[in-house]
Amino acid sequence: MSHPFETLTPDLVLDAVESIGFLSDARVLALNSYENRVYQVGIDESEPLIAKFYRPQRWTNEAILEEHRFTFELAECDVPVVAPIIHDGASLFEHAGFRFALFPRRGGRAPEPGNLDQLYRLGQLLGRLHAVGATRPFEHREALGVKNFGHDSLATLLQGNFIPKSLLPAYESVARDLLKRVEEVYLFHP
């Protein structure tokens, strides 16, 4: 079985960024990302850019663009997010079968555990994020639910060869107990 990103080489990353008019300095640094692939790409005589390559067959263009629009809305409401770069009127690009977006490079740091001022600020930001998100529903993004993100994921793990057989009974028991608790929470907060 081939991996969806097996052809996403450093050269292809550079070619993709250059395909829309940015001249790279040939530096590519892979960054942490679970679902997609994200790289810092050096740009000649300018700040590096962040290139996010979306997992093939995972997201529709409409879902990606809806995410971009939401990020722009958050930025307009002074929620500190990093919105994608709009280049020639677009924020989503395609090269060699891969869809990607470019972002300015922004640093950050994790909050200090136990710092109540930082936790309060995080709570405020989450509230603002939810307030902006509540202004209109997402139409193209999969809803976060117990079935699709819980039971379906558990079924995939149990049916595949992902968990050592010796751990399967305990894993399944704990997972089902947790999903039951999550279902109870969703009854009161769908």
Question: What is each of the regions a protein language model found here?
Answer:
Residues I43-E139:
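ATP-binding pocket architecture of kinase catalytic cores
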Residues E35-A51, P84, L179-P190:
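Active-site acidic catalytic loop and adjacent metal/ATP-binding pocket
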Residues I20-G42:
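ATP-binding glycine-rich phosphate-binding loop
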Residues F98-A101, F149, S173:
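Generic alpha-helical secondary structure signal
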Residues E18-D25, V174-E184:
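Short Pro/Gly-enriched beta-strand edge/turn motifs at strand-loop
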Residues E112-A170, Y186-P190:
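A cross-family kinase active-site recognition segment
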Residues M1-S24:
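Juxta-kinase regulatory segment immediately upstream of eukaryotic protein kinase catalytic domains
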